[in-house]
């Protein structure tokens, strides 16, 4: 079996049998992203550990092409259980690969099934499809981190006021 065919099979499998699809509660942040070019959309929820250091859950719902929906499924598999820093490095690595127009192969050790989207980089119109869920994740982490920092700041402010 050719490598390209294997990659297509991985994408099709994640599209037909998505992982982590279905919005779950509780969650720390929720974002909704739409690709205005084609209408693909995703609502993505992120839950971080109490200290904000680890991704404990990601769930999503959406509609769109096989690339956008499969890429979001792969994203969830890769980042759940990772530290926020490592998860964001994975997002960066995926983004670089699919935006490279074929010049960056991607690291299978880092990207796992995400490597199947390497061929997308040769089709600029599809890059936004592949990145939709990944950028939604990045935005949700920023939102969750900001809210946990705000809670911590308010808590410390309240402690000072009580003294």
Residue ranges of predicted features:
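Structured beta-strand/loop patches that form or line metal/cofactor-binding pockets in enzymes
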Residues: 17-62
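A generic structural motif
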Residues: 62, 80-81, 133
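Short, thiol/selenol-centered motifs that function as redox-active sites or metal-ligating centers
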Residues: 62-69
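Alpha-helical macromolecular-interaction surfaces
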Residues: 69-70, 89
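Alpha-helical support elements that line or immediately flank enzyme active sites
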Residues: 71-83
């Amino acid at each position: 079996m050719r490598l390209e065919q294997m990659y297509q099979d991985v994408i099709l499998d994640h599209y037909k049998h998505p992982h982590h699809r279905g919005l779950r509660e509780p969650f720390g942040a929720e974002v909704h992203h739409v690709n205005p070019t084609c209408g693909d959309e995703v609502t993505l929820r992120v839950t971080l550990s109490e200290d904000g250091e680890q991704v404990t859950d990601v769930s999503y719902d959406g509609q769109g092409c096989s690339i956008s929906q499969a890429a979001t499924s792969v994203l969830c598999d890769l980042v759940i259980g990772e530290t926020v820093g490592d998860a964001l490095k994975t997002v960066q690595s995926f983004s670089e690969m699919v935006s490279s127009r074929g010049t960056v192969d991607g690291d299978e050790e880092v990207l796992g099934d995400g490597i199947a989207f390497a061929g997308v980089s040769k089709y600029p119109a599809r890059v936004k499809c592949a990145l939709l869920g990944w950028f939604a994740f990045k935005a949700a982490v920023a939102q969750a981190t900001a809210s946990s920092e705000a809670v911590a700041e308010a808590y410390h402010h309240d402690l000072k006021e009580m003294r």
